[in-house]
């Protein structure tokens, strides 16, 4: 899951799919 939940990185599933990383 995504440990860093931010506005453009939620929900966790989207975070994983987008490859989002903490700033």
Swiss-Prot record:
Disulfide bonds join 2-10, 5-15, 9-20. It is found in: Secreted. The keyword Manganese does not apply. Keywords: Amidation, Disulfide bond, Neurotoxin, Secreted, Toxin. GO terms for molecular function: toxin activity. The C-terminal amidation is described in Ref.1 and PubMed:23031820, but not in PubMed:22709442 and PubMed:36235146. Its main location: secreted. Transmembrane segments: none annotated. Expressed by the venom duct. Is present in all duct parts with a highest content in part 2 (proximal of the venom bulb) and then decreases in concentration toward the end of the duct. The keyword Nucleus does not apply. One of its GO terms (cellular component) is extracellular region. The modification Proline amide is found at residue 23. Shows a very weak inhibition on Nav1.4 and Nav1.8 sodium channels. The cysteine framework is VI/VII (C-C-CC-C-C). Displays a mini-granulin fold, a structure composed of two short, stacked beta-hairpins connected by two parallel disulfide bonds. This newly described fold is derived from the same cysteine connectivity as knottins (ICK fold). The name 'mini-granulin fold' comes from the structural homology with the N-terminal region of the human granulin. Causes convulsions mice. This is Textile convulsant peptide.
